Amino acid sequence: MSSTVPTINAVLFDFGMVLTMPPDPASWERLKAVFSSDEASFHKAYWKHRDDYDRGTLKSHGYWLEVANDLHKPLEPEALRELIAADIALWTQPNQVMVDWAANLHRAGIKIGILSNMPDAMEVGIRDTFAWVEDFDHHTWSHRLLLAKPEAAIYRHAAEGLGLPPAEILFIDDRQENIEAAIAVGMQAIQYTNHDAFVREMNERGFGVLLNPVAR
């Protein structure tokens, strides 16, 4: 690695749209079916309160109650269980190439972490679904901190959890504003749009050696 390329001792991953694929269309249909809602109305209600759910100022029952109220629908216990299950399924189609890469980094002795805007029920669901989540050296789940990306404090928390200065961490996220926030706290960062573009930028930035890591 060239001396002009920062030394990277940890890779910090966003969860949704990086370690997992785009939302599963069948799960959107499951969610809409609970309320017998049209697509536009459901999406408006779903996203209206999502930031508060991710941040932890709304817990799962409170979030779905807000969605139900916006749609003028009741929220029965059976419906709540189905909504939580379908919402977990929506965001848990693994991006296997990135999951495998994270495992390779871990085996090579490079720290790996997750920094995700993640609500409470979703964290439980992904940990129940994916055993590999526990292999990460540190997890930063937004709902536990009452913070969310792109706030600087959540990036600092992730760096502290990994035990490294931000400059030694490469952060990967699908959203530009989150990438900019990571850079502002001193991290290296790459926006993930698709895997070919990601590999190309890794090589262009001088981080290509990390794509096939060797034990340290």
Give the positions of each predicted feature:
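Asp-based, Mg2+/Mn2+-dependent phosphohydrolase catalytic module
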Residues: 2-9, 13, 115, 119-216
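N-terminal helical cap/lid subdomain that shapes the substrate entry/recognition surface
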Residues: 4-100, 107-108, 119-122
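Glycine-centered loop/turn motif at secondary-structure junctions
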Residues: 35-36, 72, 109, 163, ...
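Acidic/proline-rich low-complexity IDRs
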Residues: 70, 89, 104, 161-163, ...
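Surface-exposed alpha-helical segments enriched in charged/polar residues
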Residues: 100-103, 107, 160, 180
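Structured helix-beta-strand junction loops
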Residues: 108-109, 135
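Structured, non-catalytic alpha/beta "coupling" segments that mediate domain-domain communication
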Residues: 111-113
